[in-house]
């Protein structure tokens, strides 16, 4: 009569090894699916090829892009594709967005947007190299005007083979430098 009426003794059942393995596998599969969804729809990695973005980005660096709900703005560093360039992505800085007027004084190396000279402390040297695009030019609706930070060693919107970039060709905004590890961190200006 050690049992008091109304109380029950319940022993917790230890989960079997099979149940524990199943729980672990379910958590791993869930984590992998979540990571795949994030890297499919929100983030992407890309490598820097070439020197057109010096001094900001260097050849061989690995970058992380934000692809989720992105709206292009002046100063953003973006990765884009162009039908004429095949699958090779280009990394450039947005200088102007739709309906803005871009003018470049190649003698003085100054870029103007809507008549205002840009303060460009991020460029390697002033813009003295011209291509076949005539200035001033107005950025069409749904497009952006991009330049490399290494202005005199960059194929960008000054060249008609790149030209004004339709926003649909922007893969995403560069938000983070992954490698080299000593320079790892947020990309900003």
List each model region and its residues.
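Protein maturation boundaries and topogenic segments
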Residues: 1-89, 165-189
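RNA pseudouridine synthases
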Residues: 92-103
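Short gly/ser/thr-rich secondary-structure transition/capping motifs
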Residues: 126-130
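Beta-strand-rich cores of mature extracytoplasmic or soluble domains
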Residues: 133, 137-189
């Amino acid at each position: 009569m050690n049992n008091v009426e109304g109380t029950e003794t319940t022993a917790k059942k230890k989960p079997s090894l099979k149940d524990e393995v199943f729980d672990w596998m379910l958590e791993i599969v869930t984590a992998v699916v979540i990571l795949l969804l994030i890297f499919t729809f929100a983030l992407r990695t890309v490598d820097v090829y070439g020197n057109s973005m010096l001094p900001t980005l260097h050849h061989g660096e690995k970058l992380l892009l934000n692809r989720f709900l992105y709206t292009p703005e002046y100063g953003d560093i973006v990765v884009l594709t162009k039908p004429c360039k095949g699958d090779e992505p280009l990394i450039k800085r947005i200088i102007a967005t739709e309906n803005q007027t871009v003018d470049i004084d190649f003698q003085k190396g100054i870029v103007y947007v809507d008549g205002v000279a840009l303060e460009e402390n991020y460029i390697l040297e002033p813009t003295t190299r011209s291509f076949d695009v005539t200035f001033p030019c107005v950025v069409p609706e749904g497009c952006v005007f991009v330049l490399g930070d290494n202005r005199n060693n960059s194929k960008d919107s000054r060249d008609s083979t790149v030209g004004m970039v339709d926003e649909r060709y922007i893969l995403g905004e560069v938000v983070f430098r992954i490698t080299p590890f000593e320079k790892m961190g947020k990309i900003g200006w």
